[in-house]
């Protein structure tokens, strides 16, 4: 398998981007992958310091210690990063994010970067968005999408935006699949419209991605 760094984004806020990132990291950790969350809002105090909930979830799920090196900016307010940073008087410096990413690359073979929501989430008001960060890192995207009603529209809009922006798609991950007939049709329609061949389906409650699936997805 020829691994490379990649950037995980979602079609919507609650599509399960962190859960999918966690399953991917769990499967790829043995290949010296590292997880990186550049900016996390909605953080909570634990042992006197702000803790990133996504990092906390991932490390507990995988069974490793919480790792401060997995996140650059931790913000308390549970709102978009640009607004949380304004409310808390914290200036987001993209150069710090870039430097952190480059430092991680020196220690690990590959990096799995998890964004904050979708492509148009602002990191710095009117200046810098998630899609800018993807372009800065020059990474292909793993797009996490749902399977429920509305998934076709959300997924196709994001795919079209990626194409317009010139951002490469590595593959799709259909998350939280429950085996309903309309989910099967939603997946079928998205794949037919997009002509995408590289995808994963994560079932509701799935705890791991098999080596066979990983090999196929990253081959």
Swiss-Prot record:
Q: What are the entry keywords? A: ATP-binding, Biotin biosynthesis, Cytoplasm, Ligase, Magnesium, Metal-binding, Nucleotide-binding
Q: Where in the cell is it found?
A: Cytoplasm
Q: Where does ATP bind?
A: 14-19, 54, 114-117, 175-176
GO BP annotations of the record are: biotin biosynthetic process
Q: What is its EC number?
A: 6.3.3.3
Q: Which cofactor does it need?
A: Mg(2+)
Q: Which reaction does it catalyse?
A: (7R,8S)-7,8-diammoniononanoate + CO2 + ATP = (4R,5S)-dethiobiotin + ADP + phosphate + 3 H(+)
Quote the pathway field.
Cofactor biosynthesis; biotin biosynthesis; biotin from 7,8-diaminononanoate: step 1/2
Q: Which GO terms describe its molecular function?
A: ATP binding; dethiobiotin synthase activity; magnesium ion binding
Q: Which NCBIfam families match?
A: bioD (TIGR00347)
- Protein name from the UniProt record: ATP-dependent dethiobiotin synthetase BioD
Q: Which organism is it from?
A: Fusobacterium nucleatum subsp. nucleatum (strain ATCC 25586 / DSM 15643 / BCRC 10681 / CIP 101130 / JCM 8532 / KCTC 2640 / LMG 13131 / VPI 4355)
